[in-house]
A protein has these predicted regions:
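Extended amphipathic ligand-handling, pore-lining, and cofactor/metal-binding catalytic surfaces
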Residues: 45-283, 288-355
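Beta-rich interaction/scaffold domains
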Residues: 1-50
Length: 355
């Protein structure tokens, strides 16, 4: 019940105390009792799963910001190692590129913020908290760099949240998400999508110990990059990424989504596409900034509905491997965020100048 109480998307006056109580109650249990924990959203993994050392992650929630702030906004993840490497990787790259700006962090998922706070006593600002912190610190110029993949629902909600604060600063600019403008249909691609396609493919090939993508193809290996998927109109972005892969000549690279939107990206349809192309080995990798819950469970988990299990159950392939690595730890992707932030600094972004 304590876990269920904090498994919510809204922060309230009781959140901090509820997180503390949940942690104390968990710590008071024996190992045998911990295995029996249950609730609508509670299970032993909520506190007990080893996701890495939280102390290696910097929540970037300090004061003494100065007049120029670069706020990096992410959905978030409760997987400690992924948070430090993927989200932290982007944040560190931005701080290195812009030493005269103070980099701070905000997550949009309060459920994740509460999870991390209750389990690890690490406090991460939500967007409102981060904006209030900026105001109280006298920030004048605020640039917000979302780590979101696209102009989807999360990006729209961020713009709405920031809009109510625009009069608190001399200027507020929201930079582009990773894949840039959406475009009108599945055939529309851009430099951002090309850069990400090249970066994730090169890293996947390297992690699989192949000399090249062609060498992987000759070995009968296909790469499947699994995104989240969305019912938002921005879902065409995933189709565009497949178009981008095809345009680059990456014939053994396929795009899928957990949600199966767009339809051709659903797991069963991707399985059929890979099978029809004749590949016998498959490497699954997340097309996500963070290798969090979706990568570890929906993609690489042992449950029968995970992508790994579905590919194995198809009986069409000899070998299924997974790479649990987010986009945020890839140097070329980090530098793309640096470029988007630079464009925002130069006035190319969603601009909200105070009246």
């Amino acid at each position: 019940a304590l876990i269920d109480a904090i498994y919510v998307q809204e922060r309230n006056d009781n959140t901090d105390e509820q997180c503390k109580e949940a942690k104390e109650a968990w710590d008071a249990l024996t190992d045998a009792q911990k295995e029996l924990v249950e609730g609508e959203n509670a299970d032993p993994d909520y506190f007990g799963r080893d996701t890495g050392d939280a102390s290696k992650d910097d929540p970037l929630n300090g004061d003494e910001i100065g007049e120029n702030e670069l706020l990096v906004v992410s959905f978030g993840t409760s997987f400690n190692d992924s948070r430090a490497e993927d989200i932290g990787g982007v944040e560190k790259a931005l701080q290195a590129a812009y030493p005269d700006w103070s980099v701070r962090r905000a997550f949009t998922a309060q459920i994740i913020i509460n999870h991390v706070q209750a389990r690890d006593d690490e406090k991460i600002d939500n967007v409102d908290q981060a904006l209030e912190r900026a105001v109280s610190n006298g920030v004048k110029k605020l640039i917000i760099q979302p780590t979101h993949l696209m102009h989807g629902a999360e990006y729209d909600e961020l713009k709405e949240a920031v809009d109510s604060y625009k009069d608190k600063f001399e200027s507020v600019t929201i930079a582009e998400p990773l894949l840039g403008e959406v475009g009108s249909d599945a055939t529309v691609i851009n430099e951002d999508k090309q850069a990400v396609a090249e970066a994730i493919t090169a890293q996947a090939v390297k992690s699989a110990n192949y000399d090249s993508l062609d060498a992987a193809a000759e070995d009968g290996t296909a790469f499947v990059f699994m995104g989240h998927g969305t019912s938002h109109t921005a879902k065409v972005t995933y189709s565009q990424m497949q178009t981008q892969m095809d345009t680059l000549g990456y014939k053994n690279v396929f795009i899928g989504t957990v949600e199966g939107e767009p339809e051709e990206t659903a797991c069963e349809n991707v399985i059929e596409a890979v099978k029809a192309a004749g590949y016998k080995k498959v490497i699954l990798r997340p097309l996500m900034v963070v290798a969090g819950d979706h990568a570890n469970n929906d993609m690489a988990g042992e449950d029968e509905d995970s992508w790994k299990s579905q590919f194995e159950a198809s009986g069409a392939f000899d070998e299924i491997d997974t790479q649990i690595e987010g986009l945020g730890r890839i140097d070329a992707v980090e530098q793309l965020y640096v470029q988007h932030t630079k464009a925002a600094m130069d006035g190319n972004g969603v601009q909200d100048d105070a009246e």
